[in-house]
Regions:
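Hydrophobic faces of well-ordered beta-strands that scaffold small-molecule active sites
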Residues: 8-12, 39-41, 75-78, 142-146, ...
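Active-site region of glycoside hydrolase catalytic domains
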Residues: 85-249, 260-273
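Short, solvent-exposed turn/loop segments enriched in Gly/Ser/Thr/Pro and often Arg
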Residues: 15-17, 42-45, 78-87, 142-151, ...
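Short, acidic/polar
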Residues: 19-33, 124-130, 253-263
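Structured loop/turn residues at beta-strand edges in well-structured enzyme cores
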Residues: 3, 7, 34, 139, ...
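Boundary/entry segment of secreted carbohydrate-active catalytic domains
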Residues: 3-23
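Aromatic-lined substrate-binding rim segments of carbohydrate-active enzymes
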Residues: 26-32, 41-102, 235-242
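Conserved small/polar residues in nucleotide/adenosyl-binding loops
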Residues: 280-282
């Protein structure tokens, strides 16, 4: 793994594909005026890169990479897996998350995937692999950026089944679960793993986000952090299988409590976080 950068990187997210190409050249001039030397690209381009299940199109991304490389910018290459393409949701609706109220979402927004969907995992890993293969020889790519701002929750059947697997691995026996969660309270004793359901508004958290059992709600959040981390590691390992010595990270969000960032940090080559500047900081 490379040990350091050749310079301190100064830049941010750059989405030239959202603008006419005649603007791109002007962008490069503005970057130089601002002493910007790096750009994070390809954060939300999955739909553009993979227009259908068995087709990749890197034409536009090639242009962006070449433009930045020719200007000697450091590139932080994202894997685009934070927002699903419409074709995937149409064919595989189970890739979408199910919300706190038990509603499976349709296509739209971002942070919209179920991390325990095997279909999502399959295509996210495949995309990360294809990106790494295509750009492995580009020396301007300094860091690989997996997904984007991991967060949110899903309460679908896939998550429920994997939660039970996670609990078995942690507690070994159903009696140990009952003891840890003090399920004698309100007559909640479990006798089989498949009696355990996800804690959402339809079950243990029916009163405005307050939980009947802190144990199950806390464990579900621990489980979900691990589920997201598994997705990160899946893509990270796919990139490193092609480019073993590259640096890989993802963007954490300050003191966000939804994920166990201490656990995540051990899996990251660089611990990085989002910095949203406002006018008072400029």
């Amino acid at each position: 793994m490379q040990s350091k950068f050749k310079r301190i990187l100064f830049g941010g997210d750059y989405n030239p594909n959202q603008w006419p190409k005649e603007v791109w050249k002007q962008d490069m001039a503005y970057f130089k005026d601002a002493h910007i030397n790096s750009a994070t690209i390809n954060v939300f381009s999955w739909a553009k890169i993979q227009p259908s299940e068995n087709e990749y199109n890197f034409t536009e991304l090639d242009e962006i990479v070449d433009m930045l490389s020719n200007e000697n910018y450091d590139i932080v290459m994202a894997t685009s897996t934070a927002a699903l393409p419409a074709w995937m949701v149409k064919k595989y609706p189970e890739t979408m998350s199910t919300d706190y109220e038990g509603r499976q979402h349709k296509f739209g927004a971002r942070h919209n995937f179920c991390p325990n969907s095997l279909v999502y995992q399959k295509y996210a890993k495949a995309l990360a692999t294809e990106l790494a293969k295509r750009y492995s020889g580009n020396k301007n790519i300094s860091v690989w950026h997996i997904n984007n701002e991991y967060g949110g929750y899903c309460y679908c059947d896939n998550c429920q089944n994997q939660f039970r697997v996670w609990l078995k691995d942690k507690y070994k026996t159903i009696d140990a679960v009952n003891d840890a969660w003090n399920t004698e309270f309100w007559g909640h004793t479990f006798y089989d793993w498949d009696e355990i359901v996800v804690p959402n508004e339809l079950s243990e958290e029916a009163w405005g986000g307050m939980t009947s059992f802190a144990g199950i709600s806390t464990d579900y959040r621990r489980f979900y952090s691990d589920s997201m981390l598994n997705c990160y590691k899946l893509e990270r390992d796919a990139v490193k299988a092609i480019i073993p010595d590259t640096l890989v990270t993802t963007n954490l969000m300050g003191t966000f409590k939804g994920l166990d960032y201490f656990k995540w940090a051990k899996e990251m080559d660089i611990v990085s976080w989002d910095n949203y500047l406002s006018l008072i900081h400029i």
